Design a protein with these regions (language model features):
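Residues forming the flavin
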Residues: 1-343
Length: 343
């Protein structure tokens, strides 16, 4: 982690890392509550015009069914980018938020052997598992790019809401799976959403995630690239078979994406053939949809790292100020420095 350009822990080892982080927090006097949901904020006027400040928070222990009010004049809100119930609650409480652009698309799967031979040559087995990073600008000006590439990894059913489906990718520490997968995504913004309010992007995600769920009956929709181009449901696999955490079913993946996004993905994958031989093979697998690349909202904050509600410090990926583990950690450090005055 200290010296590698792209350090890799592995999803299988990450759980143990997080456990030891929790133990260190507890050793330092912190408390970690499992299954406790933030329901709402209790806010009061400061008496200075329209200025408001945080007074306490309402939480519920979902295991015990017990509600509690926690006195709190400073709250670091480091939520994830899929905390939709919290986004709704914050919006109802008058916390200033804006819609934010993000990217959606699919996961593609290829043979890891094919990727290795293309990246390293015949001695690929003697070298670390090969990865790649690809970008393309379409004739319409949209950017198509690979995201969160997982060498020797799995495509994961990462659904978090009933009746909706989203996928993600993961690799174990050894990266020894037979397939390579990566998100191939296209940026979408307010001009693509149905509305300009703070939650327009979240509604956009839900719309397409519901289509993904319905398309394959709750299983991960999968389609061969050759059939994606023809706009027909696949009937059988070629040389590449899905390597997933969660069941798959054939569906028309093109129909669970906005038309402009689907067209851009087709153009992008075709263009990537010039960089990786075999990338646009007809039996390349497309699994959908990848819709959680980053937060669909930005919680507005000032130079003190506080929102319009004094004492509320939104930070990290869910707040719209980071796009991954490292940038989220750095934003958390900046927030802590502001609160402590640099101590």
């Amino acid at each position: 982690i200290l010296y590698l350009q792209k350090p890799h822990i592995g999803t299988d080892k990450l759980a143990d890392v997080v456990k030891h982080m929790r133990l260190e927090i507890e050793r330092l006097g912190g408390e970690v509550r499992f299954g406790v949901r933030l329901d709402s904020l209790n806010i009061k006027n400061t008496g200075n015009g329209d200025s408001k400040k945080l007074e306490s928070i309402n939480v519920t222990d979902r295991f015990l069914g017990k509600a509690e009010v926690i006195e709190c004049d400073r709250l670091i809100l480091a939520i994830g980018h899929s905390a939709r119930d919290t986004f709704l609650s914050l919006n109802e409480s008058g916390v200033m938020m804006q819609p934010k652009s993000f990217a959606i698309g699919v996961r593609v799967e290829h043979s890891q052997e094919m990727i290795g031979r293309n990246q390293y040559g015949e001695l690929y087995k003697a070298l670390p598992t090969a990865d790649y990073k690809l970008t393309h600008q379409t004739k319409d000006g949209r950017g198509v790019y690979s995201f969160c590439m997982c060498p020797g990894g799995y495509v994961v059913n990462a659904s978090s809401e009933k009746g909706m489906l989203a996928v993600n990718g993961m690799s174990d520490y050894l990266r020894d799976g037979i397939n390579a997968n990566s998100a191939i995504v296209v940026t979408v913004g307010v001009e693509d959403f149905d509305g300009t309010d703070a939650l327009a992007g979240m509604r956009f995600q839900r719309k397409w995630e519901k289509k993904a769920f319905d398309a394959a009956g709750g299983k991960i929709p999968v389609q061969l690239f050759g059939d994606f181009k023809k706009n027909v449901v696949s009937k059988e696999f070629g040389n590449v078979r899905p390597q997933t955490k969660g069941e798959t079913a054939f569906a028309n993946v093109r129909e669970i994406l906005p038309g402009e996004v689907a067209d851009s993905i087709e153009e992008g994958i075709t263009a990537f053939e010039k960089k990786i031989n075999g990338y646009s093979r007809d039996d390349t697998l497309l699994l959908g949809i990848e819709s959680r690349t980053s937060s669909p909202v930005k919680i507005v904050r000032d130079d003190t790292m506080q929102s319009n509600i004094k004492g509320l410090y939104p930070c990290g990926e869910g707040a719209g100020y980071a796009g991954g583990i490292t940038s989220a950690a750095m934003d958390g450090i900046k927030t802590a420095i502001k609160i402590t005055g640099g101590k």
